[in-house]
Amino acid sequence: MNDILNKEPMEEDYGIEKSLRPQFFNQYIGQDKVKEQLEIFIKAAKMREEVLDHVLLFGPPGLGKTTMAFVIANELGVNIKQTAGPAIEKPGDLVAILNELEPGDVLFIDEIHRMPMQVEEVLYSAMEDFYIDIMLGSGDGSRSVHLDLPPFTLVGATTRAGMLSNPLRARFGISSHMEYYQERDLEEIVKRTADIFEVEVIDNAALEIALRSRGTPRIANRLLKRVRDFAQIMGDGRVDKAITDKALSILDVDAAGLDYIDQKILRTMIEMYHGGPVGIGTLAVNIAEDRETVEDMYEPYLIQKGFLMRTKQGRKVTQRAYEHLGYVYNEED
């Protein structure tokens, strides 16, 4: 995939995303349904002087799950401790993290689906009853130690909700699905980021960047950064529609936000298989990508944009994809 359209965080994103991160719900653009629900749950918990139920945030990468976790902590007025599933390798690692929590704190675990099962099992009692029992030592000298924990809120984030075990999923009182962003929300995000970057962006340029951002704020901000570079070197520093079109064309991002591989998938299906249906494994072999990459990185956006659909027989290209790529659509195909 064209790196600029990769939804996973790149090294250059980390510092920028932190500086752009909204602090409270009234600064957070988009995800209105999720925000509305969480605002109610948080206000109710604060009125009862209770900790907020554990929250699961799930959805594609780049949609603001980490940002939402920090907003939740800020709205609660508590501290947040951040870690990631792969970093918690053994139960002792989890115990050390839990032991640092203060009453009411938020523990944010990104990629929670990647925690080892032995760690996950220790987390069950911590989430449900705020205690853990751990074994110290080994063999005849081993002993069980009971450790009470302060009440806390676990916020888990995952791009693979289906990989969570049923016992873990059941312990989240709140589950929030983060969806792809609408263009109008992405346009507002581009404008907000431009203000922070102190770069002038003309309205139609902000919309153009939004339209090509694959419904993902991370990509919108990354595109704005690159277009800003073109505007600085090839223009007068302002990001207008003309410089935006030129920059994104050079970056191989078309009007629908498709890159070379997206187009290759659709063209291969049209030219070799008359638009499908095609099995995902066969398709992956034909474009020299592994199946998981096609399923995780390309297919969701193509389906969301109406260029691809799943059937029992396999994947099929839609009439919209034919027209977008300049092919003549034959309904018999």
Swiss-Prot record:
Q: What superkingdom does the record give?
A: Bacteria
Task: Enumerate the residue ranges of region (Large ATPase domain (RuvB-L)).
Answer: 1-181
Task: Check the record and name the InterPro entries matching this protein.
Answer: AAA+_ATPase (IPR003593), AAA_lid_4 (IPR041445), DNA_helicase_Holl-junc_RuvB (IPR004605), P-loop_NTPase (IPR027417), RuvB-like_N (IPR008824), RuvB_C (IPR008823), WH-like_DNA-bd_sf (IPR036388), WH_DNA-bd_sf (IPR036390)
Q: Which Gene Ontology terms of cellular component type are present?
A: cytoplasm; Holliday junction resolvase complex
Name the keywords, alphabetized. ATP-binding, Cytoplasm, DNA damage, DNA recombination, DNA repair, DNA-binding, Hydrolase, Nucleotide-binding
Major location (coarse): cytoplasm
Spell out the reaction equation it catalyses: ATP + H2O = ADP + phosphate + H(+)
Q: Which GO terms describe its molecular function?
A: ATP binding; ATP hydrolysis activity; four-way junction DNA binding; four-way junction helicase activity
- Enzyme Commission number: 3.6.4.-
Chain intervals for the UniProt region annotation (Head domain (RuvB-H)): 255-333
Chain sites annotated for binding ATP: 20-21, 62, 65-67, 128-130, 171, 181, 218
What HAMAP family does this protein's entry cite?
DNA_HJ_migration_RuvB (MF_00016)
The cross-references to NCBIfam families, in alphabetical order and at most eight, read: PRK00080.1, ruvB
| PANTHER family (UniProt xref) | HOLLIDAY JUNCTION BRANCH MIGRATION COMPLEX SUBUNIT RUVB, PTHR42848
Protein name per its UniProtKB record:
Holliday junction branch migration complex subunit RuvB
Gene of this entry: ruvB
